Structures are given as C-alpha cells and as structure tokens.
C-alpha cells in the first residue's frame, strides 16, 4: 500500500470518531468504540468468503451433537476465529430500527469464537452498546466501517472493468494502522500511563539487536521462543520477532518464532491480542504444555499469577513497569505488606553452593527487580545458545 493510500485509510477511520461519536461520547471513550469495531470489521471481511460454509457446518455439528466444534470451524475459515451468527456487518446495517439493530448486533457478537469474545469483553465494547443505541449512533458506526470508501480486506476492491479501486490491506499494514490509532487516541487524551504500554519501535529494535547481534552468526534453521512478561500491547514481541527473522534471513537461515507474553491491564491485554490477531502474527492463541492448555498471551499479573509456569525461552526481552509497588501481588496471595517473606515462588529464590536458599524478593516498591528475577528463572541450559535476556531498567 502506498503512503497516500495509507494516509487516506488512517484519516477515514480516525475521522469516524469526530463524524459519528462527537457530542454523544466523551473523547476518552472513542478508542473503546473505534478500536474494537475496526478489529471486528477486519475479522468480518476475512470471514465473509466462508460464512455460508461455517453456518452449514455449525448446523451439521449441532445435529450430530458434537461439542468440541471450535477446531472444525477454525479449519473451515482458515483462521483462529469464526462467527456462527447469521449476520455480517454488511447485513446488520440494513436494519433501521435502533432496538432491533441492538439485538441483532449482540447476536452477531455472541456468534464469535472465544478469542474474539475475549477481546470484545476486555475492551468493554458491550458496555457502550446501550449508549450507542440510545444516541442512535450504532447504525452510523456500522455504516462507516462497511463504507465503500475503505477496504479492510486482505484482497483488493476492483471496479467493473477489473481495475483496482482500493488496495488490499495486508496484515502488517493493518497492525500498523491499529497501533497508530491507539497511539493517537492516547496522545489526544493525555494518557499518562502510555509509557507503560508503548516502547518506541527504535528502542525495541535496539533491544532485539542487543539480544541477537552477539550470537547472530550462530542462529540455526529452527524455532526460537521469545518471552515478554510485561508485554503491554505486544510491540516488543512482534518487532523482536521481525528483527530476529530478518537477521537470520541475512545469514541464509529459515527461522520461525513462537511468542509468549503476559499482561494484566485488561484493555492493554485485549489490544495486544487484537493486534496479533489482525496482523496474522499468531495462528492459535492456545498451546499445550505438559497436558495443560495455556494461552500464548496470558492474562493476569506475571508476578503472582504466572501464566507460563516452569517454561524457559531463548530470548527474554521486556520493558517492565517502573516505580510501581507490587503490594497488590501480595494481596492476591492473601498476604499483607509485612508478610513479604511468606511470598513463596520458586522463580524468586535460588540455592547457593551449600544448598542455602537465597531470596530474590526486592523492596515492595521495586517490581522491576521482580521482573528481572522472573526472566532469570526462564533461562535454559540445555541449548547451545542458552537464554539471552535484555530488560530495560
């Protein structure tokens, strides 16, 4: 996609807020509507070609009383998501009655697979449906995102002569648009915690280079595992993935990457998951480890609710929050601030040569050291390159 086309697409989506939501919603609420609707429309157009097959397969599975339907429906769509409702966003916009549109939209949302629903819930889209309906903005939002003036599909829009009218939107560009919208919304509303969510791309490339460049000539044709225990919107994971593959390709290596992360802020977690979903960086959000079903991007506090317990990685790259007390993690373990010594977790203790236990637990105000200890616990000693850790402090 050319820069002018990118700018036009970005401006169209950005202006939906000022065209439709202005006066009806506070500016701080814009991203809670625009971002999930953009994700839904992207997914919606990807699923359109297999819509009839999915509904037919769903009916057949129900008829034969098959409970575990998700893997079969994923196979039909070719994506790690599906929608079993009778609606698409295009067909939704034909309803002119506000209340019926609301009910149809809810049915449409409920038809999505678990990971899309997870994103919808964490981004709090359902909480604004009533307001969108009462202000008669729901239909307008849907109309804007299904407009013929934009194309969120991965295939170009052609005119009657077969000429390209609108370019295809590839996964990478889709992810870039999403991240840029998120950044702009936060800047417009002076989001003070944005530093917790974003690590500039140049910084991330530097982090990746620090991790990989010293051993770049030793990279092999294999799969490497990257972990970020404070992954925010996932920027470090995706950019580090790109950089490692790029450095490998320059040396004639065919490298694949598996990414693992954890985030506790619901909107940031959902943003990470949505970005990975629409950018095509991940083909399944669940994996099996030791007979346990786990999430590649886990939800919850890394410090007290380890979503990747016992696992080790090739690269641990992160920019954890700073100046944030970890006393809430004590509370989650049923402990008071004065009971820090009772916070038991094998990640935060080591044995010295005399088998004496040494605690890594820092002061309550220093969660960065906790994240560093967590990364150290992920180190592996059964591979030629071991584990490379790069963490911002």
Regions found by a protein language model. Give the residues of each.
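Non-catalytic, mostly N-terminal accessory regions of nucleic-acid modification and defense proteins
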Residues: 1-215, 284-288, 292, 299-302
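Short, surface-exposed alpha-helical recognition segments that flank or form part
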Residues: 4, 198, 324, 359-367
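Generic recognition of stable, solvent-exposed alpha-helical segments in well-folded globular domains
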Residues: 4, 8, 12, 38, ...
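Glycine- and acidic
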Residues: 18-21, 160-164, 188-194, 224-226, ...
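Conserved Class I SAM-dependent methyltransferase catalytic core
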Residues: 29-42, 207, 353-393
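Active-site catalytic pocket residues across diverse enzymes, especially alpha/beta-hydrolases
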Residues: 47, 244-248, 379
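Conserved S-adenosyl-L-methionine
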Residues: 196-318, 323-328, 332-336, 393
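A mobile, often basic/glycine-rich helix-loop segment
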Residues: 327-358
């Amino acid at each position: 996609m050319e820069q002018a086309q990118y700018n036009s697409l970005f401006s169209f989506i950005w202006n939906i807020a000022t065209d439709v939501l202005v006066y009806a919603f506070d500016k701080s609420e814009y991203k809670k509507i625009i971002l999930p609707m953009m994700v839904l429309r992207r997914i919606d157009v990807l699923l359109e070609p297999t819509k009839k097959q999915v509904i037919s397969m769903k009916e057949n599975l129900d008829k034969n009383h098959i409970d575990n339907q998700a893997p079969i429906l994923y196979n039909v769509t070719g994506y790690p998501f599906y929608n079993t409702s009778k609606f698409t966003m295009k067909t939704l916009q034909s309803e002119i009655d506000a209340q019926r549109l609301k009910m149809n939209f809810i049915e449409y949302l409920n038809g999505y697979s678990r990971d899309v629903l997870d994103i919808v819930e964490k981004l709090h889209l359902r909480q604004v449906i009533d307001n969108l309906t009462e202000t008669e903005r729901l239909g307008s939002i849907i109309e804007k995102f299904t407009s013929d003036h934009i194309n969120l599909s991965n295939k170009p829009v052609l005119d009657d002569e077969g000429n390209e009218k609108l370019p295809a939107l590839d996964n990478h560009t889709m992810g870039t648009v999403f991240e840029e919208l998120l950044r702009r919304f936060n800047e417009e509303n002076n989001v003070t915690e944005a530093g917790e969510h974003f690590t500039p791309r140049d910084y991330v490339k530097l982090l990746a280079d620090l991790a990989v460049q010293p051993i770049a000539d030793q990279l092999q044709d294999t799969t490497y595992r990257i972990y970020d225990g404070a992954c925010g919107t996932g920027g470090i994971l995706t950019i580090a993935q790109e950089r490692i593959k790029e450095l490998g390709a320059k040396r004639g290596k065919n490298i694949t990457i598996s990414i693992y992360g954890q985030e506790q802020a619901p909107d940031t977690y959902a943003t990470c998951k949505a970005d990975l979903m629409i950018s095509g960086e991940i083909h399944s959000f669940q994996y099996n480890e030791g007979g346990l079903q786990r999430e590649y991007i886990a939800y919850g506090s890394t410090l007290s609710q380890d979503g990747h317990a016992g696992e080790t990685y090739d690269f641990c790259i992160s920019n954890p929050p700073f100046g944030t007390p970890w006393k809430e993690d004590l509370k989650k373990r049923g402990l008071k601030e004065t009971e820090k010594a009772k916070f038991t977790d094998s990640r935060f203790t080591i044995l010295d040569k005399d088998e004496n236990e040494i605690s890594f637990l820092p002061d309550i105000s220093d969660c960065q050291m906790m994240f560093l200890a967590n990364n150290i616990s992920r180190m592996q000693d059964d591979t030629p390159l071991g584990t490379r850790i790069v963490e911002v402090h």
